[in-house]
């Protein structure tokens, strides 16, 4: 094992040494580039573009382009890239992950590969975790890019489609992973080419890459429409479940995240619901609602998993502690929580389009990432995304002291010890940042500190509005800050405080901006700089920022991120974790022997222990959870890869239709496929001609591709299978030609385009639902000694082929029957975005009930109305 790590770090050192040679080349150009005037420096961009047009590669121009970017940064931003930052920039350009410690200037590092790759004109996407960071970085670094003659776009929630299109057409585009992903899905639901906003996915740099590509990898992006399902059952279950007794009527398995009824619970539930058999086929819906309500009451906790804000249940991100507005739990769980909390139940939704971040980001030609902590997840980055991790050396040595964990028997004993530590350090003036894993824990700690009279700031999902401001001042003298998890990532904690944050706050009070009054802003910054420098000296004397972790996270990476908030850029600092045996990680994954050990040692509740066995147990528990989570993500990907291949086929075909690419040929191919399939159905190969159902074939043809024909079965006898196909195809193509003459080629193309797009969208939507149901039940195949993934692939392939056949049938039927004489009324499906949904301008879906949804369709297709014309009526 030691050799493995030795080799790992040797490999890393070799990579860094290799890049050091290019750094020397860049440094050799510095003096020459510094002598250029602003105009000459700006002219370098056009010069580089010309070199690329003449056949040079990005690697050929890298040294000079980096030198130009560094010089422009000195002039525009007042910041010069360190040598280690040049190494980081090269790693990002190579399409790898640069692990850089907190405070090492990741935002500035990104300017180097962003500038270089933007010269190609194909676009660069810089992806951050929230709108605040995207806006901040696009404005801050945008000054540099604009100085060098490049355009900068910003994608944030709520901007109009035309503004999105402009932002994507810029050389460099900033935005969040959610916005980029949803724009991709929306583009693939567009009905007109001018509605498209994204262009080719060329190169992306993902900030906090571990958060986006690992922590959020299991969360699919979903655009959905409202489904027509009643909500009264959720309210019914919300009244019944509290009458069931935990551990008697049902058991809660937190590790497996499941709740199961006992035999007693089943009997009691049947009695309360007034039904004979809960598991009867007729009661499947009731059973499902009861299970979701049990999960809502037994597993989901208010102020940990979600909060209730303005009569709405809002999910809390388990990794960052931020509120996830617009995102909803699926499969009715969110509605069950709404019923439990007594708020209005929003209707369930039907998936219209979906993709995981794993598959979205794998579509880029080149992807790179930055984070402070990636090495622990290198295997996953390499296996799933093909990304290597390179650890970038720090500019100054890290001198932070990481103290040993303190382990307590109970949670309250642990919190009492944390409060004592905070009080003592606060009295000396040392700033303290306390990390908690939930809102409830942060508020408990806050109340304990209030009792002791310690002034402090709380940063959690309930108080996220001033996140950057609070976290930026966490390094001030006597500052005490409580933050859930990794809230505030992306904002540096400067010892003594951040003068620019102070200055911006004062400017806001005066009602002026930095852009409108740059001279006044600079004066205010200088005033606060003197104050902050004075405080910085006092804080340094007290040991710098101290980090307290109140619980070990299930991922070592998250713990390392918390520690990394202290000791930036060679500053002093320290960190320590306080652990209780009642903590979730220890309770669910730690060894039960530890509690017994503490009892045998006769440990008092308030006395901590430092023990190698316990430290090892914590590390083992974390590794087990990390391994389990990786397996889950890999498992999700195994299934999603099947869906992804199908998605790529559908979206590629859809894009061709949208842009009108060879549409008439596409329709002719579709007609051919439908005609040949109909002959294969009614006149199968290997069956004697006398047994062919020619009457059935003609009836089928009339309902599909030859309306009102006057062919008699006798006319088709003795033709043979190929002769039949040729005859029917010739007649159908003749009808199609007449159709084009009647309507005009341009009108028919537009009809074909709209019909194809709508049918593809509707069938794909149904297919997504069917695939979800297949995936839900496929795990049971394992009991029959079959590999569920292989079975899923096989059945998904069959379902996909059936969907394609259904699309072809319906397209042909509509084209031969559609009537454009009367003005058509268009009804737009209400679209609800599961995350960051805009509610303005939405209309409910209208339904006509003249024909029963389960009645045979009057068009004669033989299908039910709901599966045929009822969808498009």
UniProtKB/Swiss-Prot annotation:
Its cofactor is Zn(2+). Its main location: membrane. Residues 835-856 have a biased composition (Basic and acidic residues). One of its GO terms (molecular function) is protein-exporting ATPase activity. ATP binds at residues 85, 103-107, 492. One of its GO terms (cellular component) is plasma membrane. InterPro entries: Helicase_ATP-bd, P-loop_NTPase, SEC_C_motif, SecA, SecA_CS, SecA_DEAD, SecA_motor_DEAD, SecA_preprotein_X-link_dom. Residues 835-873 are annotated as: Disordered. CDD domains: DEXDc_SecA, SF2_C_secA. PROSITE patterns: SECA, SECA_MOTOR_DEAD. It is a peripheral membrane protein. Pfam families: P-loop_SecA, SEC-C, SecA_DEAD, SecA_PP_bind, SecA_SW. Zn(2+) binds at residues 857, 859, 868-869. It catalyses: ATP + H2O + cellular proteinSide 1 = ADP + phosphate + cellular proteinSide 2. Its EC number is 7.4.2.8. It is found in: Cell membrane; Cytoplasm. Part of the Sec protein translocase complex. Interacts with the SecYEG preprotein conducting channel. Has a central role in coupling the hydrolysis of ATP to the transfer of proteins into and across the cell membrane, serving as an ATP-driven molecular motor driving the stepwise translocation of polypeptide chains across the membrane. Monomer and homodimer. Part of the essential Sec protein translocation apparatus which comprises SecA, SecYEG and auxiliary proteins SecDF. Other proteins may also be involved. This is Protein translocase subunit SecA.
């Amino acid at each position: 094992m030691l050799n493995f790590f030795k080799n790992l770090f040797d490999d890393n050192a070799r990579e860094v040494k290799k890049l050091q040679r290019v750094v020397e080349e860049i440094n050799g150009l510095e003096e020459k580039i510094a002598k250029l005037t602003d105009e000459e420096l700006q002219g370098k961009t056009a010069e580089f573009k010309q070199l690329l047009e003449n056949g040079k590669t990005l690697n050929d121009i890298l040294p000079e382009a980096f030198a130009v970017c560094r010089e422009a940064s000195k002039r525009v931003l007042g910041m010069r890239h360190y040598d280690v930052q040049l190494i980081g920039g090269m790693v990002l350009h190579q399409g790898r992950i640069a692990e850089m410690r907190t405070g090492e200037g990741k935002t500035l590092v990104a300017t180097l590969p962003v500038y270089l790759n933007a010269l190609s004109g194909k676009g660069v996407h810089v992806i951050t975790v929230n709108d605040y960071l995207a806006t901040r970085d696009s404005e801050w670094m945008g000054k540099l890019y604009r100085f060098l003659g490049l355009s900068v776009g910003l994608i944030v929630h709520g901007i109009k489609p035309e503004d999105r299109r402009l932002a994507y057409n810029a050389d460099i585009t900033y935005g969040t992973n959610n916005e980029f992903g949803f724009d991709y899905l929306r583009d693939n639901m567009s009905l007109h080419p001018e509605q498209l906003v994204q262009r080719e996915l060329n190169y992306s740099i993902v900030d906090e890459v571990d958060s986006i590509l690992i922590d959020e990898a299991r969360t699919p992006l979903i655009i959905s429409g409202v489904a027509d399902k009643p909500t009264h059952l959720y309210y019914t279950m919300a009244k019944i479940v509290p009458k069931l007794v935990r551990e008697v009527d049902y058991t809660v398995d937190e590790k497996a995240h499941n709740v199961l009824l006992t035999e007693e619970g089943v009997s009691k539930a049947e009695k309360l619901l007034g039904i004979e058999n809960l598991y009867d086929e007729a009661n499947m819906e009731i059973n499902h609602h009861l299970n979701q309500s049990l999960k809502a009451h037994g597993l989901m906790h208010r102020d940990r998993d979600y909060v209730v804000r303005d009569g709405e249940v809002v999910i809390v991100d388990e990794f960052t502690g931020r509120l996830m507005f617009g995102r909803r739990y699926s499969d009715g769980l969110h509605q069950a929580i709404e019923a439990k909390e007594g708020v209005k139940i929003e209707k369930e939704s039907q998936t219209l389009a979906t993709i995981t971040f794993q598959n979205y980001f794998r579509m880029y030609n080149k992807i790179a990432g930055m984070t402070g902590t990636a090495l622990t997840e290198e295997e996953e980055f390499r296996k799933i995304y093909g990304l290597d991790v390179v650890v970038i050396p720090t500019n100054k040595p890290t001198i932070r002291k990481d103290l040993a964990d303190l382990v307590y028997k109970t949670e309250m004993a642990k919190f009492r010890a944390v409060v004592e530590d905070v009080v003592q350090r606060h009295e000396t003036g040392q700033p303290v940042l306390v990390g908690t894993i939930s809102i409830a824990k942060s508020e408990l700690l806050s109340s304990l500190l209030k009792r002791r009279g310690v002034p402090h700031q709380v940063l959690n999902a309930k108080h996220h509005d001033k996140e950057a401001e609070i976290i930026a001042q966490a390094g001030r003298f006597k500052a005490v800050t409580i933050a859930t998890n990794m809230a505030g990532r992306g904002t540096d904690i400067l010892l003594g405080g951040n003068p620019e944050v102070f200055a911006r706050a004062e400017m806001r009070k005066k009602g002026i901006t930095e852009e409108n009054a740059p001279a006044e802003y600079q004066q205010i910054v200088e005033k606060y700089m003197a104050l902050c420098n004075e405080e910085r000296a006092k804080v340094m004397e007290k040991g710098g920022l101290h980090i307290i972790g109140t619980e070990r996270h299930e991922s070592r990476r998250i713990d390392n991120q918390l520690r990394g908030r202290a000791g930036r850029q060679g500053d002093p600092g320290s960190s320590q974790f306080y652990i209780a045996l009642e903590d979730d990680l220890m309770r669910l994954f730690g060894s039960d022997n530890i509690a017994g050990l503490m009892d045998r040692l006769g440990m008092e509740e308030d006395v901590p222990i430092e023990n190698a066995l316990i430290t090892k147990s914590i590390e083992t528990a974390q590794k087990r959870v990390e391994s389990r989570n990786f397996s889950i993500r890999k498992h999700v990907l195994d299934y999603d890869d099947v869906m992804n291949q199908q998605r790529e086929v559908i979206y590629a075909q859809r894009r061709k239709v949208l842009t009108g690419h060879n549409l008439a040929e596409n329709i002719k191919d579709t007609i051919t496929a439908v005609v040949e399939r109909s002959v294969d159905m009614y006149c199968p190969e290997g069956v004697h001609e006398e047994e062919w159902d020619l009457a059935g074939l003609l009836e089928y043809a009339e309902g599909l591709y030859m309306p009102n024909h006057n062919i008699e079965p006798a006319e088709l006898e003795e033709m043979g299978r190929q002769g039949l196909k040729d005859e029917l195809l010739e007649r159908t193509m003749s009808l199609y030609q007449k159709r084009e003459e009647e309507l005009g080629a341009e009108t028919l193309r537009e009809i074909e385009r709209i019909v194809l797009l709508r049918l593809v969208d509707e069938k794909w939507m149904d297919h997504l639902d069917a695939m979800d149901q297949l995936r839900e039940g496929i795990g049971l195949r394992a009991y029959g000694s079959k590999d569920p993934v292989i079975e899923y692939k096989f059945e998904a392939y069959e379902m996909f082929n059936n969907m394609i056949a259904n699309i072809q049938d319906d397209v042909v039927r509509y084209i031969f029957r559609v009537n454009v004489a009367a003005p058509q009324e268009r009804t737009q499906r209400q679209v609800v975005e599961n995350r960051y949904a805009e509610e303005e301008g939405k209309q409910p879906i209208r339904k006509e009930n003249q024909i029963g949804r389960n009645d045979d369709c009057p068009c004669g297709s033989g299908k039910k109305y709901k599966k045929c014309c009822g969808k498009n009526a």
